[in-house]
Amino acid sequence: EAIAQGRQRILLTLATGTGKTCIAFQAAWKLFHSRWSLHAQTHPAAAKKRPRILFLADRNVLANQAFNDFGPFGEDAIVRIEPGEVKKLGAVPKNASVFFTIFQTFMSGPEDEHGNKTPYFGQYPEDFFDFIIIDECHRGGANDESSWRDILDYFAPAVQLGLTATPKRTVNADTYSYFGEPVYSYALKEGINDGFLTPFKVLPIVGTLDEYV
């Protein structure tokens, strides 16, 4: 609904283990099969073309997990962007519909003749991606002082969906300032009450380790 209403930045807050990747998959799947794209919104004839979707994470384990979960799209539609493969090919991959990478890979890149780093994300046109999913977006991607923010600003034309398990706090206020208030939230307590998460108890343990350090 948020995409249909023209929202450019969207935030979902769900407790860990309650299906953030599944929701990201379903959103991408629907856009992919409906042939939705930013260009098609103003040029209906362009609706014949599949959208280009980027999944950004801050750790390889998350990017790899998402890449495997998105397998139903078909091996010709998805691609994992890795620095070794980019160096081998001499360029970033562009012949796919759903791209997976981590911020660190996109921020890396060769130096130009003046010794300035040219990040790999700059090899894509600014309007290359229609939809960007930012997993664990509270980890710094929306921070004004973060170099990761350069990626989000560069691909500003795309609809950006931030996923986080962290409720609003002082330390992640930048995330909420950038994306706005969540369009949907599902708290840890709700996940436990609904049977999706295991109840837990916090047991304080008093140790003597500090006496020996």
Kindly give the residue locations of the regions a language model identified.
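RecA-like P-loop NTPase motor core of helicase/translocase proteins
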Residues: E1-V213
